[in-house]
């Protein structure tokens, strides 16, 4: 089940250069780190990764997993395979959400999409991390999952009314291994990224969607089940 409709408006994310020789430390300068993140993603054409998405809030705890594909400019595809199949994708202009076996598919222009995942598509573009996340800073009070990683915090532009903070965990080689979105209602969504592969060949057809025959197309800005 996709959680809270707007879970993509995250804006850019955090990393170091691939060839950074020194491990990240709590003393890392935020401005320098943000610049390295921007440079890293500016040179990335595609990204493929396994992901785990965990939601907790309102007495609900839910974990899903699947494969994420991203391609410049602004295209991404989330293929959920556990606990049941479903697909979210965007070609940079239109976003689609479809659960196989259902009689309808949801569609909306990307510019109208109200979901916290959507800004992830800007990772493979000319992004400026410090401009995308208000109050970007180190989060020494939040322990990273893996030794050597650094955790940053900030609030996505224009989302302070619903987002308490967004946490970004960065690995020593400059990859984002985790994103945590903590909302003002007390709920939290965590994305973990594994087996990340950069600049692999991803066909454009992966970001196109044709509704199966007999499927109703429903317009809307929120993608929930």
Can you name each region flagged by the protein language model?
Residues 2, 24-62, 211-225:
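N-terminal leader/targeting segments and the immediate start of mature chains
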Residues 2-12:
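Bacterial N-terminal signal peptides that target proteins for export
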Residues 11-21:
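Bacterial N-terminal signal peptides
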Residues 28, 131-221:
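Gly/Pro-enriched, hydrophobic low-complexity segments
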Residues 45-47, 64-66, 72-74, 84-86, ...:
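Envelope-exposed proteins and targeting segments
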Residues 67-119, 189:
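An acidic-aromatic
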Residues 103-148:
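Flexible, surface-exposed loop/linker segments and immediately adjacent secondary-structure boundaries
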């Amino acid at each position: 089940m996709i959680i809270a409709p707007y879970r993509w408006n995250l804006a850019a994310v955090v990393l170091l250069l691939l060839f950074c020789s020194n491990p990240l430390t709590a003393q890392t300068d935020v401005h320098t780190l943000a610049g390295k993140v921007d440079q890293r993603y500016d040179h990335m054409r595609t990204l493929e990764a396994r992901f785990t998405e965990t939601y907790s809030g309102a007495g609900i705890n839910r974990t899903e997993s699947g494969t994420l594909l991203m391609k410049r400019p602004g295209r991404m595809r989330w293929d959920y395979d556990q606990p049941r199949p479903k697909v979210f994708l965007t070609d940079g202009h239109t976003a689609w959400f479809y659960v196989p076996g259902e009689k309808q598919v949801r569609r909306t222009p990307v510019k109208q999409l109200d979901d916290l995942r959507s800004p992830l598509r800007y990772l493979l573009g000319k992004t400026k991390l410090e401009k995308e996340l208000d109050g970007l800073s180190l989060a020494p009070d939040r322990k990273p999952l893996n030794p050597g990683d650094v955790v940053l915090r900030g609030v996505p532009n224009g989302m302070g009314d619903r987002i308490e903070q967004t946490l970004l965990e960065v690995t020593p080689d400059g990859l984002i291994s985790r994103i945590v979105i903590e909302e003002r209602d007390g709920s939290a969504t965590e994305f973990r990224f594994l087996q990340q592969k950069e600049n692999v060949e991803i066909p454009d057809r992966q970001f196109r969607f044709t509704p199966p025959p007999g499927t109703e197309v429903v317009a809307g800005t929120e993608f929930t089940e």
